[in-house]
């Protein structure tokens, strides 16, 4: 009888220990989940748009890099969102918005060897600069990076380029990002009227990220800022309900999406570590003016001027690969 009581007592103690351990583990998991949520919230707050009107995106470390063949097998928004797109929570993207096979069949190639310019580079946010930019030096801003891209296209590829250095986010001696797209549009339309041969529009920006994020890779031995292709979907996410924005009509939306996809996949095949996932937001930005319109983010505020300018070498190669007919 005593042995039975001892066994029951031991069993009871074991059960109690198991319960205590289970509760402790459960509390640990709850604390871990809470800390992770807080970290995400903290990072989101830290990632608030610094001095740029465009979004902040800290790249996730995906091991798998999408290429043309793997992209063709992606049919769901979940797959596309994992490997190709980063969809901002303010945007409502539908599976019908993206047809990979259709997009990859679009032919964007042009004869870029003509004497008349086919490419326009401009900067809706001309005042964006970098961590080591010298105050007052245009060469150290995104405009200087755009100038370097233009030089590469002209000197290395023989492609005529128009580089617009208009300051659409600088008014009355101050940086004013609000309304910069509305200021940019009539000025850029005048350039298109002056150069009707232009068919490719590149709105070049740099992103804004927390101070501990450095969007850099190495290409051919050079420290190189990562790039990100950017699309506006002209549809808001209204608490899970799609809200179209007819006042921001973009007749070239599918062309824009197809072009950024081709550029992104080409980048992955030529320079696997260069491109961040394509960012999707509402609105239309500067992408409604031409079918071959693109918005490209070059690095961020934590990159150096050298890193940003180094990114123009592979970017030019990617552009020519996708857009040049022969």
What does each model-identified segment do?
Residues 251-279:
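Active-site-adjacent substrate-binding region
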Residues 273-326:
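Active-site-adjacent mobile loop/cap segments within catalytic or ligand-binding domains
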Residues 210-248:
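A short, glycine/acidic-enriched catalytic loop
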Residues 24-112:
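N-terminal, intrinsically disordered, polar/charged segments of Gram-positive cell-envelope systems
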Residues 1-15:
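N-terminal Sec-pathway targeting helices
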Residues 126-129, 167-170, 206-211, 233-237, ...:
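Solvent-exposed loop/turn segments at secondary-structure junctions
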Residues 134-217:
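Catalytic-core regions of hydrolytic enzymes
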Residues 117-137:
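Short glycine-rich His-centered loop
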